Amino acid sequence: MIINEIEIETPFGLMNTFITRPDENGPFPVVLFLMDAPGKREELHDMASRVATSGYYVMLPNLYYRRTRNFVFEPTPLGREKMLAQMASLTNDLAVQDCQELIKYADADPYTNKGPVGCVGYCMSGPFAISAASALPNRIKAAASIHGVNLLTDKDDSPHRKANQITAEIYFAMAEKDKWADPTMVRALDEHLKSVGTNFRIEWYADTDHGFVFPNRGAFYDKPAAEKHFERILSLFDRNIKRTTT
């Protein structure tokens, strides 16, 4: 595997980004791997690398780059307060702009195939992935939200509002015990996406809680469910961004 830490020049500053890909048999389809609230870290590097081993050029950006290059979450009340402040600095529109910058960079790299792009967002980035799919329908052809939050809200930028523009296949992995994504919201999301003709699947992961895919999340980590999520997203990418370019 090839691993690089690079800085992408954007109109908003330098976006430090972890990039990983196989060392043979390229060029590769691009996958945007969007972090959860605790930020870009080694745990996510490992997860992104897991995806890359299946034949993808995976980009994991620090979405907090406008405020800090290296955010380190501390599991204390003050640490949580700092994390929430970082989260509040982001919007769906800003995340879409970042995805555009990532794709622009990837298109200039000879190891990418310049074809359909995949995107996966975790927790706070679930809506970012869906928003990117609606804003960039000509490029993003597969998107996944893993225990995502704020997928359907009353705000003007709620990701469901432009779902009719999505051309990608969408996958939602929902944690059964997730207090941040209650069943009422998910049912409303399901009904709305059906009404606009989105190609999607919502899957509930039984007896799991928010953050179940992360190995360092202690009791919240559910290895069988985490492995299933990898199976689902890799299958999603295979159908939509790999097979169409080989």
Language model regions located:
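N-terminal cap/leader regions of alpha/beta-hydrolase-fold enzymes
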Residues: 1-246
